[in-house]
Every structure is written in structure tokens, then in C-alpha cells.
Amino acid sequence: MDTKWKQLLLSSPKPEFTTGIMRWGITLLFSALCTCSFAQTKYQITVETLLKEMTSRDEMSRYPALPYRSMQQSSYDRRSVSPDRPNWFANDDGEGFIRLEERNGRKEKVLFEDKGPGAITRIWLTTFGSINTILRFYFDGKDEPGWEVPSYDLQKFGVRGLKKGLIEPDNKWNRGSLIYLPVPYNNGCKVTMEELTPERTNRHFLFNYRKYPTGTPVETFSQEVADRIPALAEKTSDALYKNMDKGFDPQSDYGKGSLNHQQSFSLNKGEKQKLNLRTGKRAISLLQFNVKTDKNLKPGTDDFALLMRSLIVTISFDGKQTVWAPLSDFAGSGMGSFASRSFFFYSDGKGIVCSKWLMPYKQDCEITILNLSPYKADIQTDIVSQPYEWDNRSLYFHTAWKQERGLPVVTWMEHEKCMDWNFATISGRGVYRGDLLSLFNHTAEWYGEGDEKITVDHEPFPSHFGTGTEDYYSFDGYFKSQTPFAGQPRQDMRNFYGYNSFFRVRCLDAIPFNQQLKFDFELLGWENGTVDYSSTVFWYGDLGSEATGSSGLEEIEAGLLPTPTQSPVCNIPNAIDFCQIQPTSKSERLRYDRQRLSGHPGKWNLKDHLVCHGGKEGDYIEFEFSGFEDREYSLSLYCTKATDYGNIRLYVNHPKNGKQLDCYSEKVEATNAIDLGTYKPVNGKFILRIELIGRNPLSTGTLFGLDCIQIEPL
């Protein structure tokens, strides 16, 4: 690239896509770039360039050379129009889509649509219902799809080489799927969904994407492109995923010119240690703390949690402090300092905390760790630094932490009483790279129905309007996992009571901003109550960039609540909950999911049940209960009734005649105990078989719900 044009590109960090003059200037700039450089490369953006960017920590530390906008389209409730109008917090987030189109006799819902050059960088899909759909990608204004996915399951995306790291999960449907494979397009993209079953179900989805300046030469995704990238896709997947389990390794090669700064010290309450690094244009490539304590201070205990929360890490670059966070949160773990793994940080849950963000500086760097806990901490630090080429795009690493207690959460049915909580507001120029939400939930229900709303540079409507905390953090609600870019290090209880932690770090879906980034979360849940929230945000920015409203020592010194040992729910005595066990056998087409029921009156064992759907008459599901003595037991079943529920027959140990139950009701309600009779176990086991036998004429479906079973000795 000609030096003159390179300098022009690097010195134009503040594009305004809504300003005609600036758009015209950018168009001229890229026309010139095309003349002097793209004649050889043809495309500036390809799947290959984006995949390589995903593993370049150096590029992540810089403002984008190509000034794209980072945006999101989702299934959020379309009644949410403005904060000064009703329904700003409306929660029918699985109903939203752009429009319905008819094409060649098909009805297709438009989920995503963009014009001009861009690239989809992340897709998240989740549903309680059938995944029997077809997703179609239409590129560059064409009438025929350029790519099809034969399911509401991104594991079937159809590109060879995709593995964990670029696609999650990689083996089976867990009610949610996620893909990070970039899908670029030169002149627009539209994604539609065709339902292949008449079943009415909610579809939650998120599309993160980049919007490039007009005229940017982008190679559109196609079968030809897909056939070209398997080796690079596999290499990228491996680089992302295999790096998650690594902390400091003295045998590793961290690059030419790397230096390891190692120091050990002890800190009592109120003491701090300063670490000064080599001066000059360098960058920290790895920062690890190994905290060793008295043998009585064991990982997983409240005392250990307090210690890790009370060790405060601050980092100053070139005379300006840009990092302030508790050590547990700096590692992406949150309260308790549980194990966390991602592309950017690692914690073993036992005292080793490792940050792998690249942290450049021009002149000097000072790291300080302060102990505010009542416990002595023996700490070993390993810091790896390397030379860094500083240019006009280079940015400093920033981290900020805040905590607020007693925040009011309201049920989604009373959404008009909801409020937004400011997760973070960042001023200056920078690139938003990720965050951690760590909290204590005082309710016995899911608290995270609230959507994220991210506005960039004072835009009139959020460019990121989400569908709930679980979707933002790629969490399907019930299965904990940790991936290169998202994870759930902690969940104390199945109903989300107590401590919970979620992290998300951003790669191609990072968000550049020139003046301000404002991030709010709605405080919406399944039950009225309170939560204690703390947020840790990670971004790269100019030296003067900062987060407003950050917390300090006063919130650290407030301490932590003890880990709860019991959830405040209505437990049915000696009950075995169907959501806590797996069926031993079922019909192939019958599906099941755990479903929260706290929005409905009635008493379920743990305010949830196992909903079975997709079945037809004759389909069944079986459960086995073992470990019983050779004596008589009384068996009682608790179920759910609703307007779309069918008729079932209940068998114990496969007798000839079972007990029939009509599960239809005009409203969602919990049944009382259903007496199944008195039985002796066979070889110490009871086998319960539930068979679908039809439906009430008034019912609109054939679902059924199982709460729990009581097996009481006589």
C-alpha cells in the first residue's frame, strides 16, 4: 500500500456513517486504495482475512484500519420503540422478525437484512420448540439463496473444518447453537427462515455484523469460498479452543524479544506491591498471578472468595491508570473466583489467574496489587512482555468495575415497572472487547429476562437491542459451558438463586466507538425481588478514555454474602424432580425441555417442569428409579395442565392397564398429587412409562408436563 494512503487511513479514526460529506470522503479514499492496491488483491475483506483477524491479538489492540460499524439484529419485541413510549421493556422477544415474504410458494420470515458491504460475525439461535426449519442466506440482492442451513441448528451449517472454537456446541442440540464463522457479503445480505412444521413456537436469534463503508471490496460468501477454507477454519478453531486451558508456561515461545518478569511476595491486609516493567515501546502479552494461602483457606469456600475479591489489581500505562478491578473479576470469574476459560483469560479456580489481553504502552507500565482482605496472601507473578510497533491505531488496554446492590427486578408480566441498569458508560475513542456480569440473585427465579441495549456515539436507537441475558452470554439457560468467547463460571442453584457469573469477550463482534459507548441491561425477571449486580468491562481505548460511575474500595469493603445452601422454593417432601433426571427411553420424535413456570399461579416442586413436545399418539417416555428395598411403596405423580396439553396414560412397571389423565385446562396449572397406586419394586427399581394417547377435543395440542414423583414407603 502506498505510504501516503496508508497514513491517511490510519489517521482517520472517526468516521460518521450518517454524515454525507464524511461518507463521500471515505468513498474517495477507498476508490484511491482500490486503484493503488486492490488491483492485485481484488478484495480487501474475505473469509480468510477475517479468520486470520480472529487470532491476532496485535490487531485487536488497535482501532480498525477499516472503520466499520458493529451492529446487531435480533428477535426483540418490536413494540419497543422508544423509552418515552409504552412497551419499551416489552418481553415477547421470541416473536420479532422483520417481515414475512412469500417466495416460490414458501413463507419465509426475514430474520436479518443489511444493504451494502458487510459481514455477519456471530449468530445465536435458541428455541424451546422444533428445530425443523430451513435457514436461507440471500446475497447481493439475488433472488436465489447462496447458502442454506437445513435446520434451526447451526451445527448443520455445512462448512467443513468447523470445530469447537468457531461453532458451539459441536456435537448435539442443547436448545441453543452458536457460530462465529464470518459470513461476508459485498452488496447486502438477507437471512430468512421457513418453518417446516405447523407447531407455533418462539424463535430467539441474534445476528452480530459489521457494516463497512460504501465501496469496500468484499468477497461474498459462497460454496466456492466454503470449499476453499476447511484447513484455515480448522486451524482457527484449534487456535481459539486449545488456547483456553493455558496459563503461563515457561517452556512456551512467546515470540522474538519476549521477556519474563517473575517476582514473589507476601501481602497482609492493607499492604500492596508495585511491579515496574521495562521501558520503551512494548506490550504485556501475558500477566499471571498465582495466589497461595493458608491450607485452611480452601478454594470454593467463602473465605477464599473474599480473598480473591479483595485483591485489587491496578495497571498504569504511560503515567495514566487504565485498569482497576478485583483479581477474581479481572480473570473473568467473578464472585468466588471459580474456574474460567476463554481466549483472553484463564483461571483454575484454585488461585491461578492469567490475563492474555495484549497490553501495549509507549514508555512505561506499573502494576500494583493491593490486599484488602483479612488474610495473608503469598503471590507469585509471571509477566511476559514483547516489543510492540506503535502506530496511529494503537490503543491502551482498559478495565473498569462497578457494583450496585439491592437493584429492583420486576416480573416480565409487569414490564411497565421495569428500569434499565447502566452496565457501563465509556467515553472517548476505543473498541469494546467484552465484559463479566457477576451477581447475587435474591429471588428464587430467573432474573435475566432483561435485554441488553448498547448505543454508540449517541445514536438515537440502540444498535444492539437483545433478547435477554442468556442470549447475550450465549447461555441456553440450563447447560453451563465455557467457550473461547463466552462462559458461565458459576451458577449456585438450578433455579439461579444465589451467585451467578457470566462472561462474554468479543472478537470480530467487537464494537468501535469514537465518542461514547453506553451499555444498559433491563432489570426484568420471573419474580419481583432484588439482585446485587457487579460488572467488569474490558476495552481498548485512547489514554483518556474512561468509564463513568465505576465503583471503588467502599464496595469491596462491603464484603460478600455467604454462599446459600438451600433455595427458598416450595419443595414437595421427598420428591424426585423430573428436571433433575434423564429418561431411560423415549420415542425418537418426542422432545423434552426444562421450562420455568414461576409466571403462573400454582405450586410446582422447584417452580419448573419437564415439558414434552413434538409427539404423536402412541409416543412415550420412560424413567427409572432405583435403590429401593423389597417392600411396598406408595407412588404419587405431580403434573401440569394447559390449553394445548394432551391425554396421557401412566404405567408403573409395565402393568396391562395404566391410569389415564386428561391434561387439558383453560389455564396453566399444577395438578394435585395423582395417586398411581401401591407397588413393590422389581429388582429394586420402579419404571414409570408415560404414553401419549390423544387429546381433549378442546385442547389445541398434545404436549404434556411432568413436575415430580413421590415414592413413599408404607
Regions of interest found by a model, annotated:
Residues M1, N290-L297, I690-G694:
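Short regulatory "switch" loops immediately downstream of catalytic or recognition motifs
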Residues M1-Q40:
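Bacterial Sec-dependent N-terminal signal peptides
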Residues T3-W5, T314-W324, I709-L714:
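A short, hydrophobic secondary-structure junction motif
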Residues L10-S11, I26, F30, C36, ...:
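Intrinsically disordered, low-complexity segments enriched in Ser/Pro/Gly/Ala and basic residues
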Residues C34-C36, C189, C354, C365, ...:
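Generic recognition of cysteine residues
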Residues Q40-Q566:
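Beta-strand-centric surfaces of beta-sandwich/beta-rich domains
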Residues D451-V456, G466, E557-L714:
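Extracytoplasmic
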